[in-house]
């Protein structure tokens, strides 16, 4: 898959997010994916200050994403709207034709086990996130309501992680 290095952002499965892309390798990756209507593989950089990352500058777990919309801006950069599909892990990554190409394996999500431990952890997670949201004051009540309505545990964890202010 064409691979897009990201700085200071992680895209999770089921997340829809606009990205601003300006580096030639990144634009080439988008163009390659769109030419074949393929998904793109999004990998966070280990150090976001690295201007021209190599394969060793990228994390090994990322997100396979669908490109929903592309808008070329007058300054030569591209605004792209992506939706995370599933988590993936790099098997191999190489630089070819001015872009990164990755062979990716799917990362298995944990099945929703029907046991009391999982349910207790889920309740604790929701309570802790609610407290975090009250302290943070930047998370709207509708987001909290949406999160409380998510039944799938993997999706719940990804959605909460997407709303936390964490450093990579």
Language model segments and positions:
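N-terminal low-complexity, acidic/polar interaction/targeting segments
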Residues: 1-168
């Amino acid at each position: 898959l064409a691979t897009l290095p990201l700085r200071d952002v992680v895209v999770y499965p089921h997340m829809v997010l606009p990205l601003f892309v300006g580096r030639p390798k990144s634009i080439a990756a988008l163009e390659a994916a769109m030419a074949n209507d393929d998904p793109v593989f999004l990998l966070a950089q280990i150090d976001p200050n690295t201007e021209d990352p190599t394969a060793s500058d990228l994390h090994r777990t990322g997100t396979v994403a669908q490109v929903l919309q592309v808008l070329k801006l007058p300054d030569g950069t591209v605004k792209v709207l992506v939706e995370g599909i599933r988590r993936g892990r790099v098997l191999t990554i190489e630089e070819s034709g001015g872009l990164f190409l990755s062979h990716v394996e799917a990362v298995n999500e944990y099945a929703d086990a029907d046991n009391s431990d999982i349910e207790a952890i889920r309740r604790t997670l929701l309570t802790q996130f609610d407290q975090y949201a009250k302290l943070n004051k930047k998370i709207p009540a509708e987001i909290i309501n949406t999160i409380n309505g998510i039944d799938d545990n993997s999706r719940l964890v990804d959605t909460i992680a997407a709303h936390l202010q964490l450093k990579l």
